[in-house]
Amino acid sequence: MTAKCIMVLGTTSGAGKSWLTTALCRYYARQGLKVAPFKAQNMSNNARVVASDKGSGEIGSAQYFQALAARSVPDVRMNPLLLKPEADTHSQVVLMGRVSDALTAMPWRSRSNHVWPHIAAALDELRSENDVVVIEGAGSPAEINLSGSDIVNMRVARHCDAACLLVTDIDRGGAFAHLYGTWALLPERERVLIKGFVLNKFRGDAALLAPAPQMLQDLTRIATVATLPMWWQHGLPEEDGVFDDRSTASGAVKQTVAVIAYPRISNLDEFQPLKNIPGLRLMWVRSPAELAGLSASDWVILPGSKATSSDLAWLRAQGLDAAVAAHAGRGGAVLGICAGLQMLGKALIDPQGVDGDAPGLGLLPLVTVFELDKTVRHTQATFADGIAAPWHALAAVTVSGYEIHQGITQPQSTPATAGEVARAVLPGGLAWQNAAGNVLGLYLHGLFEDPGALQALFGAQLNGPVPTLDVVFDRLADFIELHFQPGVLPGLLT
């Protein structure tokens, strides 16, 4: 078996590659085909834990969801290279699911020759096991300053002779220039791989686009095969590396969940389910003023981070440490997830001297000691019966999620002052609650993606069951089936 490869390229980041790849995975899976997704290199702090007989570790969240859409088991070959930014000029390198210190230390232009054999082998294995491999590119294939070290776009397309779709975000303006310019910058041997142009995020009457699609086809000999309407609430997390900075609310606002948006925020995709809860406003916060209007019934969340110490320093520099403490002091709910849990403690200890020791926010009497080894695993655990309000709805609820962290967190060893207690509310040091109950920290990612937890926390606000991922994937497939020109999607396989 040698799979046919279909590749989604974009004129820019944020053009719509990730969700279109996901939709194609489900579309072809519904045709009874064995499908796998693939992205050679992903730069994202949104990662998921995978474990299969092909290996275990981390892959980009987008490829994880694409695998589920394809009705396949996520594995490390689907995203052989994951770059997790830790600073503006530095990323941790994850190769085949595992952190590679050697590649992390290597200048990025020097990596391509080292990693390409792994990328090619992973893709070839997936091709040998499937009928279709749907490949996602990165950024633009026409970054001519990077073409010599390309390992994610046209080098991949040439390797597997992929049928490529080039998608652009027409809502930004300049879509036809983006499409033509991208095509024009490619050499002829790569132009011939592009089988169609896709206009994404269009508002209005598609007939008004004429005669531009035909003019573009006259210039390039490539047809515009789909005009996809704007669709804000498709149900998938935002594309990797694209930060959805809009506050969202469904219906009249009854409660606000404010997520601190520090520079190296990670796993922000786990908050996607909150966007669909009636009466709940999800907002991303970068300044104390944005927290000033919150009531005690509103939540503040400190999410995951790929650079805990520097993001904690940033939080302090903005004055958000005092704002979070003030909200907690008023009895407002504060939730820390992973790095957020570590920040809520008394101290962060760095025995290796990488980032140095730092005081925490002091809202939980905990101490975190960073370690070189990373914990990467799926986890299922049950909340204690005695978990206090405002989190009491989670009492005895079993949740499934995942851990990706470096460090161990424990109660401080010195005697606590009166009333200063960290109560374990999940086993194994996974979650702690303060004496008042309003501050909760947990290592478990995916709380809001767990149906039982979501129902427990927001059941009164939900209008029926939350759509499952399967429903979301089928809606995506229905959407492209409706808006692609007849025969295009089957024709990509010929």
From Swiss-Prot:
The keyword ATP-binding does not apply. Gene3D superfamilies: 3.40.50.880, P-loop containing nucleotide triphosphate hydrolases. CDD domains: CobQ_N, GATase1_CobQ. It comes from the Bacteria. The keyword Ribosomal protein does not apply. GO terms for biological process: cobalamin biosynthetic process. Keywords: Cobalamin biosynthesis, Glutamine amidotransferase. Pathway: Cofactor biosynthesis; adenosylcobalamin biosynthesis. This is Cobyric acid synthase. HAMAP family: CobQ. The active site is at C338 (nucleophile), H445. Residues 254-453 form the GATase cobBQ-type domain. Belongs to the CobB/CobQ family. CobQ subfamily. One of its GO terms (molecular function) is ABC-type vitamin B12 transporter activity.
